[in-house]
Amino acid sequence: MKSDIRNLDLNLLKALDALLDERSVTRAAARLALTQPAVSGMLTRLRDAFNDPLFIRAPHGMVPTLRAQALAAPVKQLLTDAETLLQPVVFDPLEADFTWTIAATDYALKAVIVPFIAALKPMAPGIRVRIIPESPATLLAQTERGEVDIALLTPHDTPPELHSRALYQEEYVCLLREDHPQANQPLTLDRFCALEHVLVSWQGDSFRGVTDDALAALGRTQRVGLSVSSFLVLPEVLAVSEMIAVVPRRLAKMASGMKIAAPPLAIPGFTKSMAWHERNHRDPAQQWLRELLLQTSQQER
C-alpha cells in the first residue's frame, strides 16, 4: 500500500528521528520534551503512514526495521532542510548579486539616486540598479508584478495600497545664471513677475504651475516663456538666456554657473517619499536598500 505524505508532519518526523537515535520511547519522549504516551501515539501514526512496524521490541530496547533504517538519513536531511527554511535570511551586501528597479522622475534621479549610487557601489558592488520612468497610474500594478521594487514620488501620487516613508521635505528657490542682470540685485515681487520664466511641467505642455497658484493668491501672475518636461535641461537654458526658473533647492545646488535666490513670495514645497509593495516589505535586502536610500537622501540637504 502506498504511503500518503499528507498523513505526515514535521512533528512526526522529529519523533521518528528521535526514536531512531534513542531506540526507546522513554528516551525519545525526554528528548522531545513530550510524555511517553504522546510519543507512543506518534509511533502508531508513523507505522500507519509508512505501513511498516518501524521498530520491534527487543530485550535492550527497540530494533529498527529495514524500512526504518532506510528512512534515517532522508528524515535527518528533511529536518535539516526544514530548519534551514525557518532560519532568518542573512543579507550580505558584499555578496549580493541582483537588480533593484527604481521608478523615478528626472528630479529624483539627480537629487536622490545619484548620491544613493555613490554610497551603494562601494558597499554592494554586485547590486545593479535599473531606473525607469515614474508612472503613478500604473505603479501599483508594476509593484505587484515585481517590475518596480521602489518608487520615488510624493505622498499625493502614492497609491494607498503601498507602504511609504518620507525621505525629506523639499523647498523651491529661484535659479538664474551668475552674470544675469538680476543676479546682484534684490529679487522683488515686481521684478520676479516681470522676468521671463522657464516652467517645468510633467508633459512639457503646461504654462501653469505651483508658482502661478502662489502668485494668484496675491493677485499677480508670472510671464512663462518656455515650458519643458525635464529639470535637467534648465541650467543649459538659463545659461544662454535672461530667463529665471523656480526649481527645487537640491537641483539648484547641483547646477554650476548659476545664482540661487530666495523667491519673493511663499511657494509651497513638497515631500519626497519612497513607496514599495508588501511583497518586498520584509525582505532583508530590500530593507537594507531602503534604509540606505533614506540615509543618503537625508544627508544631501
Residue spans of the language-model regions?
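Short helix-boundary/capping micro-motifs
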Residues: 17-34
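A short LG(V/I)-centered, amphipathic sequence patch enriched
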Residues: 47-69
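Interdomain hinge and pocket-entrance segments immediately C-terminal to HTH DNA-binding domains
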Residues: 60, 66, 90-109, 123-127, ...
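Flexible hinge/capping segments at coil-to-helix
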Residues: 94, 161-197, 286-287
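Central regulatory/effector-binding core of bacterial HTH transcription factors
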Residues: 95-159, 221, 228
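A late-sequence structural motif
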Residues: 112, 178, 189, 260-301
